[in-house]
Swiss-Prot record:
Oligomeric form and interacting partners: Homodimer.
Catalytic activity entry: (6R)-5,10-methylene-5,6,7,8-tetrahydrofolate + NADP(+) = (6R)-5,10-methenyltetrahydrofolate + NADPH; (6R)-5,10-methenyltetrahydrofolate + H2O = (6R)-10-formyltetrahydrofolate + H(+)
InterPro entries according to UniProt: Aminoacid_DH-like_N_sf, NAD(P)-bd_dom_sf, THF_DH/CycHdrlase, THF_DH/CycHdrlase_cat_dom, THF_DH/CycHdrlase_CS, THF_DH/CycHdrlase_NAD-bd_dom
Keyword hit for Cell division: no
Name of this protein: Bifunctional protein FolD
Organism of origin: Xanthomonas campestris pv. campestris (strain ATCC 33913 / DSM 3586 / NCPPB 528 / LMG 568 / P 25)
């Protein structure tokens, strides 16, 4: 007797980060308006850009536009290539004590400065709206929500817009950077997932098995097509943080999108998935920092 053919996989639904980010920004604008109506100060965000790297300039421009949309005042500090660590440290000290500034954003990478961590640690943790300061990461590790790293927090918001439960699910994170992979693991642990982290020392067979077992897959490495779409578990939620420009000019993620989209339940596009959520979450953190300051 011939076995029945397996049911055809339905194409994944797109997690439209642009739309969800716009909804978040609209809500933040209402909160800023209410804050101003109550006689409180306008939230202020210092945006520090060193050099003229094209990619960094695009990111900063998007952040400034988002700030304008929600009513946050952006204070621009566009510094020349060759700005020293000492000069940046002096600027951070000035911003730390400026009552008009509720959030400080240092756009990374910093050209000519090999260790940006010293500067990040110099930012007042109460104004660290990127969520990179060790004190804020430590609060997250202790399950004390404060200013959380923007990309992982934005991904949690994306997950809330699916019809998939998070608690009790198997989650695999590929990539363990300080800004995405590691705090993403903390976020998913807090949400009740069983978390597996994969990195450059993970054997290929273990990586494949971990991906195939993932109900929630987050990939943040920066290598186009690192994860074949055929590895994706049917019905999984796929969050592709990678954004890579190919020789032909196309932007692609770290996951083979076409094959993954035929297997996943939900998947983020690249571009238009995680990136807009990171920017919107930066505004969310800035407003929360202003609210905490009074």
């Amino acid at each position: 007797m011939t076995a029945p053919a397996p049911a055809a996989l339905a194409p994944a639904r797109l997690l439209d980060g642009r739309r969800i980010a716009e909804e978040l920004l609209d809500g933040l604008k209402l909160r800023v308006d209410a804050r101003l109506a109550a006689g409180k100060t306008r939230p202020g965000l210092a945006v520090v850009l060193v050099g003229g790297d094209p990619a960094s300039s695009v990111y900063v421009r998007n952040k400034r536009r988002a700030a304008e949309k929600v009513g946050i005042e952006a204070f621009d500090y566009d510094l020349p290539q060759g700005t020293t660590e000492a000069e940046l440290a002096a600027l951070i000290d000035q911003l730390n004590t400026d009552p008009k500034i509720h959030g400080i954003l240092i756009q990374l990478p910093l050209p000519g400065i090999p260790d940006a961590n010293r500067l990040i640690q110099r930012i007042d943790p109460r104004k660290d709206v990127d969520g990179f300061h060790p004190q804020n990461v430590g609060h997250l590790a202790l399950r004390e929500f404060g200013l959380r790293p923007c990309t992982p927090r934005g991904i949690v918001t994306l997950l809330a817009h699916t019809d998939q439960p998070v608690r009790g699910r198997n989650a695999t994170i590929v990539g363990v950077s300080n800004h995405v992979g590691r705090p993403m693991g903390l976020e998913l642990l807090i949400a009740g997932c069983t978390v597996t982290s994969c990195h450059k020392f993970t054997p290929p067979d273990v990586l494949e098995a971990s991906v195939r077992n993932a109900d929630i897959l987050v990939v943040a490495v920066g290598r186009p097509g690192l994860i074949p779409g055929e590895w994706v578990k049917p019905g999984a939620v796929v969050i592709d943080v990678g954004i890579n420009r190919l020789d032909d000019g196309r932007l692609v993620g770290d996951v083979g999108f076409e094959a993954a989209a035929q297997r996943a339940g939900w998947i983020t596009p690249v571009p238009g998935g995680v990136g807009p959520m990171t920017v919107a979450t930066l505004m969310q953190n800035t407003l929360e920092a202003a609210d905490a300051a009074g």
